[in-house]
């Protein structure tokens, strides 16, 4: 009897053993150890699947289905490994909806062939062993009556009951560890099970099958009346930001607002090639318009004038471990749905009459009479922006494919709209200037969010990248050896027959060659093309600033420039900044540009700084795109409910601070949708293990970090419930 039972269960054993072997591979490859902490939770789900398929009275059918599931598990191993290598992230359900975007952005640099080979070999070995077991099983043909005998049915039911009971018991136990409204909820395993806020920590606790099950369980966003009331009460109890007696609140009241998100921009784009000096070595020659926004035009004409006061703020600790769609949402909505996508909460199925996103920046400014526009120099359907952004509050949503000429004809068609066929960013800004600065600017104020694309990777030579073709000779050889061709719109060599030996490298190119040629020779050329994209962006900014001045509204416009993330394509930033490819805890690697040009800051600047020392406001608080909405609202004099936004105004005093090498710094926590939580000097992925950057390990810092971190996670959880259930209309404290 036992031999007969074991024979019939061979396919079950094949699947269970195969799943556990692949689980061990997953944990090893992601650096999580051997097996999940809640092994039984994960194993119960594996057993449930195994016995569910065992019901099929055909060994071959069982084998095929088991093999397919194991194949999916292998694919998931590779997906998680790739995401972890590129972003330090793991899979979530919303990524399935972005497969087209991911495919378009994919390059060979994101394909790990050695890992694919190893996984394929492991999979083949498992499948071959399974096939041998199948042959052994098929010696005894299954008779349906025998397969569904009383003994087999009892066996199936017993195993399934055990698996289900164990799974439910584990869920009940984990849920009992902390109540949703308790102070310890966000640091508990309950929180890890019920949310995907900390993917790495959740995966290491519950395993592959447990993690996916938790994600699927979390897709049910319906909440009971008690939780709904608690959510609304949380926002109604939120403290209003209304510092009317501060020095910045309302200094830009009524101003136009232009927010420009600069694709993959680094501070070293604005330098002279000596990248180790970072921000402190900015160069006017290559990016004059950004340089002018930072230092001011008066400085360019008379840098020794002791009475200079500029209107800019430079955030030198602006941080983003992020992706484009996340950073964009932070600056538009103040958050991003965790484990979901924008299409889930604001896509086709969203009822715009709910006004659920009226707290977004376009929503608030629209209510104040602003003309609100979103402009992108790539096609507007990318990331489904054509479906979501009008629901987020924008009156006008325009991509490259929607820009029309004066005759009403599309400016860009055909190949112009393909991925990596970037128009020169400056030319796009000229063609789209009436979308960026509305023609009714003199009738009502406007707010425009402009997302650029010219500095997007990959940074290999690309003849379809207009800025690459336009600037590459200028970047290498400068005006001495190059001349601008008005017909082609490109810088060309004066002597087209000149050899490299006859040309004089620019200071920038000479420094790049000196610093990187021996270590990363290919990086020198990648940096040339990356720099070309940055120069195209700078040209676009110049087009916008010139038009504002032409309309005589430059002094009535607040401009925010910020980068979405570091240049992770080709590991460019890792090479330049000197970080390992797998370094996901680094603060410096993820520190990128953010600049505010504000007419009101000129007056504020004169009272805050010594013009002989610095002519812009130097903000060294750890900050991010989460802080853009609160900061802009602060400058405009707009009161807001602080519980609705994850960030703070850069001018807001904060609750906690700590010492960083003798200097007191604010405790600000950043949640990364690509994995992990950070403050200026600490990183964690699970609130148990901490990596320190720049300071020695300090328990007091950990305690303050955890205290602020818990506040952030509690706020995120309530914002998630608010967005998923469209409850904003029921919040009275707005």
Language model regions located:
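Short, intrinsically disordered/low-complexity patches at protein termini
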Residues: 201, 209-224, 397, 471-473, ...
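Alpha-helical protein-protein interaction elements
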Residues: 22, 159, 192-195, 201, ...
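Short coil-to-helix leader/linker segments, especially the first N-terminal amphipathic alpha-helix
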Residues: 215-246
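A broad, low-specificity signal for short, low-complexity segments enriched in glycine/proline
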Residues: 64, 83, 213-221, 407-410, ...
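Short, charge-rich amphipathic segments
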Residues: 4-19, 26, 211-225, 282, ...
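Solvent-exposed soluble domains appended to multi-pass membrane proteins
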Residues: 236-734
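Transmembrane and membrane-interface helices of multi-pass
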Residues: 2-211, 715, 725, 734
């Amino acid at each position: 009897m036992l031999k007969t039972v074991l024979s019939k269960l061979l396919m079950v054993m094949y699947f269970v053993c195969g799943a556990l072997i692949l689980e061990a591979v997953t944990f090893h490859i992601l650096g999580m150890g051997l097996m999940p902490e809640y092994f039984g939770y994960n194993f119960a789900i594996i057993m449930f699947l195994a016995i569910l398929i065992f019901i099929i009275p055909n060994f071959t059918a069982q084998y095929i289905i088991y093999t397919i599931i194991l194949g999916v598990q292998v694919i998931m191993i590779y997906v998680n490994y790739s995401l972890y290598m590129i972003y330090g992230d793991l899979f979530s359900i919303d990524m399935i909806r972005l497969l087209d975007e991911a495919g378009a952005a994919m390059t060979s640099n994101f394909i790990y062939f050695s890992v694919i080979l190893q996984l394929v070999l492991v999979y083949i070995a498992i499948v071959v062993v399974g096939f041998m077991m199948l042959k052994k099983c098929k010696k005894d043909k299954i008779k349906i009556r025998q397969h569904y005998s009383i003994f087999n049915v009892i066996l199936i039911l017993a195993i399934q009951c055990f698996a289900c009971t164990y799974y439910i018991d584990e869920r009940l136990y984990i849920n009992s560890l902390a109540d949703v409204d308790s102070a310890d909820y966000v640091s508990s395993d309950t929180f890890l099970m019920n949310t995907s806020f900390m993917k790495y920590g959740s995966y290491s606790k519950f395993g592959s099958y447990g993690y996916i099950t938790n994600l699927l369980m979390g897709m049910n966003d319906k909440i009971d009346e008690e939780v709904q009331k608690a959510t609304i009460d949380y926002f109604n109890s939120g403290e209003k930001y209304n510092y009317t007696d501060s020095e910045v609140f309302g200094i830009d009241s009524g101003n136009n607002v232009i927010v420009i998100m600069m694709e993959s921009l680094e501070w070293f784009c604005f330098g002279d090639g000596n990248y180790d000096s970072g921000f402190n070595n900015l160069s006017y020659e290559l990016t004059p318009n950004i340089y002018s926004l930072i230092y001011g035009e008066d400085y360019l004409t008379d840098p020794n004038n002791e009475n200079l006061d500029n209107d800019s703020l430079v955030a030198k600790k602006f941080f983003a471990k992020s992706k484009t769609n996340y950073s964009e949402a932070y600056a538009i909505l103040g958050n991003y749905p965790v484990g979901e996508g924008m299409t889930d909460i604001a896509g086709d199925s969203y009822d715009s009459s709910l006004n659920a996103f009226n707290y977004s920046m376009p929503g608030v400014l629209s209510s104040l009479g602003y003309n609100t526009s979103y402009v992108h120099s790539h096609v507007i359907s990318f990331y489904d922006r054509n479906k979501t952004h009008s629901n987020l509050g924008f009156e006008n949503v325009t991509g490259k494919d929607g820009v029309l000429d004066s005759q009403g004809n599309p400016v860009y068609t055909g190949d112009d709209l393909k991925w990596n066929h970037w128009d020169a960013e400056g030319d796009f800004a000229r063609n789209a200037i009436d979308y960026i600065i509305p023609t009714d600017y003199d009738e009502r104020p406007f707010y425009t969010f402009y997302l650029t694309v010219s500095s997007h990777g990959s940074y290999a030579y690309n003849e379809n990248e207009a800025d690459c073709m336009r600037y590459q000779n200028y970047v290498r050889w400068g005006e001495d050896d190059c001349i601008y061709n008005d017909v082609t719109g490109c810088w060309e060599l004066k002597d087209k027959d000149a050899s490299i030996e006859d040309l004089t490298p620019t200071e920038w190119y000479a420094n790049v060659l000196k610093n990187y040629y021996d270590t990363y020779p290919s990086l020198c050329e990648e940096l040339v093309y990356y720099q070309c994209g940055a120069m195209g962006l700078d040209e676009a900014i110049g087009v916008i600033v010139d038009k504002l001045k032409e309309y005589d509204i430059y002094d009535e416009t607040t401009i925010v420039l910020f980068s979405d993330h570091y240049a992770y394509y080709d590991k460019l930033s890792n090479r330049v900044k000197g970080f390992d490819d797998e370094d996901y805890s680094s603060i410096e690697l993820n520190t990128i540009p953010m600049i505010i040009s504000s007419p009101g800051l000129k007056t504020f600047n004169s009272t805050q700084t010594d013009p002989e020392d610095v002519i812009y406001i130097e903000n060294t608080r750890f900050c991010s795109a989460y802080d853009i909405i609160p900061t802009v609202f602060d400058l405009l004099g707009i009161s807001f409910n602080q519980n609705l936004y994850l960030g703070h105004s850069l001018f807001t005093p904060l609750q906690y601070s700590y010492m960083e090498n003798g200097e007191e710094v604010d405790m600000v926590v950043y949640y990364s949708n690509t994995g992990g939580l950070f403050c200026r000097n600490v990183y964690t992925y699970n609130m148990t293990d901490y990596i320190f950057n720049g300071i020695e390990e300090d328990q007091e810092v950990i305690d303050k970090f955890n205290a602020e971190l818990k506040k952030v996670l509690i706020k995120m959880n309530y914002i998630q419930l608010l967005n998923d259930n469209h409850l904003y209309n029921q919040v009275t404290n707005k």
